[in-house]
Amino acid sequence: MRWRSTLLVASGLLCVACGPISKLPPLVSEEVEAGRRKQQVDHIRDYFAQRARLNNVALRIRIANNLDCRNRSTQIGLDAGTVPSLPRKFRSYSQEALSVSWTQATVISVAETSPATAAGIKPGDHLMTFNNEAVPRTDTSAWISHFVDNNGEQPIRVLVRRDGVDEIRTITTVKACAISVELITDSSPNAF
């Protein structure tokens, strides 16, 4: 019995050794890099599209449950940033994927029923100032959240640049639950 299994393994190895050899054509490094770049750009666009959908739902939930929350804050319902303010893994292709500026805060997404939408702010707009205070190019999203929270329920005059034209938009803030909602890219379940 043992000699049969040895013979079977040996004949299998012999057949593998006598099989045809295939060679893949050489790949051009520029084509490989272009494919990698396209994958990264698509990944960034997909991630921020999912994040925008999540923010739409989260803002509605926060506003609807406003009276039931212990911790509340004022919110305007937009996500903005500059290339340096984005997470490091998104910086290299974010300008191409999202048209985000290096120096001016660019609106990445606006929640559908948000105060920012009511004020006419759209993705791609550049946010120059909030109540004549310049929007910084680093930690942009955190700065906006902090500014809106400190401003309270007072309207915010935002200088918006769209297609090279500056306009003042007035955003009337809304009180909402101050619960954190984040999009995490992890395959393990974290909610039950």
Give each language-model segment a name.
Residues 1-7:
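Bacterial N-terminal signal peptides that target proteins for export
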Residues 8-16:
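Bacterial N-terminal signal peptides
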Residues 17-39:
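Bacterial Sec signal peptide processing site at the extreme N-terminus
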Residues 37-50, 110-115, 134:
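Second-shell loop/turn segments in exported
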Residues 48-105, 170-189:
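PDZ/PDZ-like peptide-tail recognition elements
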Residues 58-69, 120, 131, 147-151, ...:
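Sec/Tat-exported extracytoplasmic proteins
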Residues 116-139:
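Conserved PDZ fold ligand-binding element
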Residues 143-184:
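PDZ-domain C-terminal substructure recognizer with occasional recognition of PDZ-binding tails
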